Amino acid sequence: LSTAAQALMPKPQTTMQPQTVTIREPVVPRDLVYGRTRKGGVIVFLHSSGPSNEHLDLVIVLATHRVKSIGAIYFEGEVALDADGTAQGRWAGKVLVEKKLGIANQTAFAGLQADLPDKWTEDHQLRGCAAIRLRLTYDQDAFPGGIPNITVDLEGKDDIWDPRTQSAGYSENPALCLADYMANPTWGIGARIGEPDGIDEMSLVEAANICDEAVPLTGGGSEPRYTCNGVITLSEAPKTIIEGMLSSFAGRCAFSAGSWRIHAGAWRAPDVALTSDHVREGGLTLATRVTMSSNFNGVRGQFVSPENDWQPDDF
């Protein structure tokens, strides 16, 4: 394997962290969302209005790209608005929402523009960014602690190219998600699918097919062999991001014969059978990665679990 390929094979440096906090900072790295997740965002607009400043308007950017859907909205982990935008429980009549998926030609939040025309104009379009606008109306029972932590269910990036269908759309296929990231010239490495010095299309198709293989479940039914669901923070180096995405499908990425070749982890039929006739006189010497005394006999892992309120959970 080439030096570039070897560089993409170490243990990923990324840490397992929940993304369920909404922040207010002047400068933050952008987020990419692949697959399904629940996450916070960045408050880019905050303004109070009304005779007693009882209304609080917030605009929260969730992702740096177009997404498939923005679902239910949570205040401090409780459903405040369902996927249709209907306020629930004690928040009924106290909160409303507008959603923008981040399409290229999206317009400004119409409700916010109507409510605060001198603060939010038709030029505030947030094109290319998925975002929500919330209006909170003060109520002691609804907001006893002030502004709640706000999180949102998302189905992420939905312009991922699939060479098998020659079309773009939403995908949880990790090989396709990795190729989408690597192909981006702004935050990836500009390795476009099927182009010189880009991603080899045949190897990508093979990897994508492996990821989509149906694996039977002990309780019945099946699930894809590998899926990709999570958030990428673009403050990380491309090498670190690629390593982390490769780990989601036991993958390897090699630069060979002028192209990047993506391989998914799966059993493959051997090309050749080695026998004693292939061994040089003197035998073999096996050098393991770790000594026998420091070897392991068990593995524990973590993943961000939807069943555990999108917090890290053990396998």
Where does each model-flagged region fall?
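Solvent-exposed coil/turn segments that connect beta secondary-structure elements
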Residues: E78, G265-W267, P306
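Acidic, small/polar-enriched beta strand-loop surface segments
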Residues: H65-S69, S276-F315
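Short helix/loop capping segments that flank catalytic or ligand/cofactor-binding pockets
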Residues: A83, A254, H263, D271-V272, ...
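Residues in well-ordered beta-strands of folded domains
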Residues: Y74, D153, H263, Q302-V304
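Polar, S/T/G-rich
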Residues: S2-S247, S256, D309
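Short, charged/polar, Gly/Pro-enriched secondary-structure boundary elements
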Residues: W267-D277
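Beta-sheet entry/capping signal
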Residues: A72, A250-A254, S259-R261, R300
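Surface-exposed fibrous attachment elements
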Residues: Q13-Q17, R268, N295
